[in-house]
């Protein structure tokens, strides 16, 4: 079996790109898989230097769609199946190249994402454009929450996985804080993700403002297309009184994330929308207790009070953080329960096997063409309490 992964980029990073790259490397241990994507500068670009990765051209919109389409046509006869990894570049490129059979993976809802960036009128436009691109191909999503949003396309659920071995030998807290440049003493919060409005970092800023003994690390780039660094500057201007306690470290390489997690006491994730957040999975795998926003995908992962905590607003988030900060035994028990849950249910091996099973069924013709349905089809287990 030969499979071609088709994605937008690797170099810029982001949880979804890293999660799909992890699936790509995992599958290479079982079948022949190559990755075709666009070239983008970023701290993660060195990940694309492994065998099997090919650039079709630079990451520019909309020209990048044409680059990918041409590259797909050139190699189309060499592959048994095509795995589409993003809705903006690889999906229209594979559609135009008539690459079949193909599977489509969504780790976000592009209809909502476009609406946030460009306004509700673009949300409606995206809905119209997306329908013919997705219809007739198996759609895979990485959470029940996304499956509910795409119900009419009969989505199949393959939960995101994390390479738990990356978190088996973490440095000590003291060594990690020295490495990231944060002095010991205060309770240290950490969040990982791009500094963009959907991450709702004002909640984190409010938590730090309300708890004088707390500092925070924000690990993620704060310049992004469309947003530039406007959101980052707005945060700095809105919270001048806590600038010395909130450290924006920018984008770091994938292998540096475990050290930043090891330096912290509590992981905070106030995002307003996610698919299956890779950052949260990695925080739980590292053994950190987590306090996250109460949104559907987080409810799939978190059993409130046991594997983490769900907060409905910044005041509740601050209260939960304060409780954890004052009770080391609670931090330990919640962090351990979260780590055990991820290791038992959300390993990268389980995710890889689910994709392998999907591909075998698709090539064998066992999966019918997409048609409206009432319930999503589940290929891997979800957490429902």
Task: Kindly give the residue locations of the regions a language model identified.
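Short hydrophobic beta-strand element within catalytic cores of glycosyltransferases
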Residues: 280, 289-292
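Membrane-proximal helix-turn-helix segments that form the acceptor-binding/catalytic region
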Residues: 121-138, 235
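Conserved donor-binding/catalytic core segment of Leloir-type glycosyltransferases
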Residues: 4-5, 183-199, 205-209, 217-219
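Short His-centered aromatic/hydrophobic patch
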Residues: 84-90, 109
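Short, structured helix-loop element that forms part of the nucleotide-activated donor/catalytic region
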Residues: 44-48, 215-245, 256
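Conserved acidic donor-binding segment of nucleotide-sugar-dependent glycosyltransferases
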Residues: 303-315, 323-329
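Aromatic "clamp/platform" in nucleotide-sugar-dependent glycosyltransferases that forms part
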Residues: 272
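A short, histidine- and acid-enriched strand-loop-helix "catalytic/donor-clamping" loop
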Residues: 103-121, 222
């Amino acid at each position: 079996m030969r499979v071609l992964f088709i994605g937008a980029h690797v170099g810029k990073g982001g949880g979804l790109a890293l999660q799909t790259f992890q699936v790509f490397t995992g599958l290479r241990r079982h079948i022949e898989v190559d990755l075709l994507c666009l070239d983008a500068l970023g701290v993660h670009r060195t990940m694309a230097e492994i065998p099997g990765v090919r650039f079709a051209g630079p990451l520019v919109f909309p020209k990048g769609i044409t680059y990918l389409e041409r590259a797909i046509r050139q190699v189309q006869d060499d592959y048994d199946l095509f795995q589409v990894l993003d809705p903006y570049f690889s999906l229209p490129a594979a559609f135009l190249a008539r690459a079949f059979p193909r599977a489509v993976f969504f780790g976000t809802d592009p209809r909502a994402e476009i609406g946030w960036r460009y306004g509700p009128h673009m949300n409606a436009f995206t809905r119209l454009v997306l329908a013919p691109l997705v219809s007739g191909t198996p759609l895979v999503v990485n959470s029940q929450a996304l499956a509910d949003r795409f119900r009419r396309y009969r989505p199949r659920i393959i939960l995101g996985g994390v390479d738990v071995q990356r978190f088996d030998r973490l440095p000590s807290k003291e060594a990690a804080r020295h490495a990231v440049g944060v002095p010991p003493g205060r309770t240290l919060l950490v969040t990982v993700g791009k500094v963009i409005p959907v991450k709702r970092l004002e909640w984190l800023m409010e938590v730090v403002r309300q708890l004088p003994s707390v500092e925070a690390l924000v690990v993620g780039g704060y310049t992004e297309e469309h947003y530039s660094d406007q959101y980052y500057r707005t945060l700095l201007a809105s919270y001048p009184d806590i600038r010395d306690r909130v450290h924006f470290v920018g984008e770091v390489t994938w292998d540096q994330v475990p050290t930043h997690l090891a330096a912290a006491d509590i992981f905070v994730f106030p995002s307003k929308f996610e698919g299956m957040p890779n950052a949260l999975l990695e925080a739980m795998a590292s053994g950190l207790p987590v306090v996250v926003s109460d949104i559907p995908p987080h409810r799939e992962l978190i059993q409130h009070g046991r594997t983490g905590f769900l907060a409905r607003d910044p005041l509740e988030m601050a209260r939960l953080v304060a409780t954890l900060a004052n009770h080391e035994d609670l931090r330990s028990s919640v962090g351990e329960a979260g780590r055990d849950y991820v290791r038992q249910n959300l390993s990268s091996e389980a995710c890889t096997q689910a994709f392998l099973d999907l591909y075998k069924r698709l090539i064998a013709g066992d999966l019918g063409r997409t048609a409206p349905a009432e319930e999503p089809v589940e290929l891997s287990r979800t957490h429902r309490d």
